Amino acid sequence: MKQLIGLYEAYFEQVRAAEKRLKPADGLFGMGERLANAPCHDAFWEALRAFLEGTDVKSDPGQAYQALDFIYRAPFAYPDVHPSVYWMLLAVQGLTQPVIACLRPEDAQALYLWYQKAYPRRERLPVQNQVLETLKRQGKRA
């Protein structure tokens, strides 16, 4: 979990650094740089993908649950982030689908119930609907 939390903290730090480099009028009328286009977002995506594919998360159901719980709650745990960061925190949830298969059914069911309440249907992105469906299927394997 320390490594996962470290990924998020490093991402937030990179975003802050990118924000400091922006000029006051950047992004105005589509001119100049925009924080949403900063390379730190792609780097975070790749780092999280590598973490989920290359660590013990898939081999330990307990670690899988902790990692998914953290990733799914991150948009709520960091409410004061830039909008581009918020959307990235939602988008990376799609990377978690292979890890869901490693969950114990009861853990998948618990995450499913929480996720369904935390992300109302009218506010969900398509990737979140996919995550929810995968959690539901894994929870029924009991």
Regions found by a protein language model. Give the residues of each.
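Non-catalytic all-alpha helical scaffold/repeat segments
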Residues: M1-A142
